[in-house]
């Protein structure tokens, strides 16, 4: 392998985007941010997501994943509607608030094809993007055939180790995360190789608990000991689904591989337009599931959503979603009460 090619690195003056905020020991609310324009009816229910400046993402989201780094050959990234300098400035705004901005690699429609020998070139490109835009880490969001296509499973982890070690040498912490669909986390699942290769390097895993229809988890002790299949699309059992699937993953039981609880983040859709299935109708299901996990000594790191843009989108009838996800779960994750929450509760009391 060659060394880091510093001719690819754009020298930047020390600024807020040069920071790499720490998420160690912190609960996180993570949201994906769309790097493409909205269409008239992009949602699963024909709604429309909001185009949002990165710096306008609500502060409840203390980790923002920019979607996506992709392309043939060595994948890359370019802001779709602002200059490189302006994008870096906006990353700096979030960094100055202690918020991390990750670059997400892949996406549902991305064809990523890495070959043996591209470890260093990929590491060089990631470093170039970090130095250009101020990213604080990389999120692996490979889906479908891209997960194990070509040499992706060996080249990508090797490149990320080079990048993380590079920034560690500068006294910085480069974040590595993943957002796999949960069926790929069974004991023989496609993502297990990434977990093993990046053991000791990854910071958190945010499985997608959505778009999986009737897939779920078999719980032998449920149903009075007779066992029960608890499916992702069973809204009546949503709390149990969130609890048992998470418990299975953080303990490595019921056919799933183990991810430490303090590195585990539940991924949920912002609303019914953001995913075909998986939306949580009653938010108390999330709060109760998290409480049950904590009581069992398995408190997790936080929640993730697809996406911040959908969180402020509109329905088919142009009814605003009005940041429902961050309003619901920001206070739950960060342990603070917001003015919006207090106002809503006051209005609720007056209406009684």
Give the ranges of each region predicted by the language model.
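Chitinase-like catalytic core of GlcNAc-active glycosidases
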Residues: 6-249, 261-265, 270-285, 313-325
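Enriched but not universal
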Residues: 1-12, 341-352
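Substrate-binding cleft of secreted/luminal carbohydrate-active enzymes
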Residues: 35, 252-350
């Amino acid at each position: 392998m060659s060394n880091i090619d510093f001719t690819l690195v754009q020298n930047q003056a020390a600024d807020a985007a040069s920071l790499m905020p720490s998420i160690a020991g912190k609960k996180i609310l993570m949201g994906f941010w769309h790097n493409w324009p909205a269409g008239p009816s992009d949602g699963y229910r024909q709604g429309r997501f909001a185009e949002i400046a990165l710096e306008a993402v609500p502060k409840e989201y203390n980790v923002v994943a920019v979607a996506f780094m992709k392309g043939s050959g060595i994948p890359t990234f370019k802001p779709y509607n602002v200059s490189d300098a302006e994008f870096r400035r906006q990353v700096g705004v979030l960094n100055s608030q202690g918020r991390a901005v990750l670059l997400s690699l892949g996406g549902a429609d991305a064809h990523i094809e890495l070959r043996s020998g591209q470890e260093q070139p990929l590491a060089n490109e990631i470093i170039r993007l970090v130095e250009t835009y101020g990213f604080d880490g990389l999120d692996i969001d490979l889906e479908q055939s891209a997960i194990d296509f070509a040499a992706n499973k060996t080249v990508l982890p090797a490149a990320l180790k080079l990048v993380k070690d590079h920034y560690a040498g500068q006294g910085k912490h480069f974040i590595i995360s993943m957002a796999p669909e949960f069926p790929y986390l069974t004991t023989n699942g496609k993502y297990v190789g990434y977990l093993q290769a990046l053991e000791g390097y990854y910071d958190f895993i945010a499985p997608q608990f959505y778009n999986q229809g009737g897939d779920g988890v078999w719980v032998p002790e449920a149903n009075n000991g007779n066992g029960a299949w608890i499916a992702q699309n069973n809204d009546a059992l949503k709390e149990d689904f969130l609890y048992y699937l998470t418990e299975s993953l953080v303990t490595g039981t019921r056919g799933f591989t183990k991810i430490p609880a303090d590195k585990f983040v539940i991924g949920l859709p912002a609303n019914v337009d953001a995913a075909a299935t998986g939306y949580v109708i009653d938010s108390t299901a999330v709060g109760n599931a998290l409480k049950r996990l904590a009581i069992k000594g398995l408190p997790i790191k936080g929640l993730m959503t697809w996406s911040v843009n959908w969180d402020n989108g509109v329905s088919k009838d142009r009814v605003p979603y009005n940041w429902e996800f961050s309003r619901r779960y920001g206070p739950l994750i960060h342990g603070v009460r917001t003015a919006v929450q207090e106002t809503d509760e006051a209005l609720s009391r007056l209406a009684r």
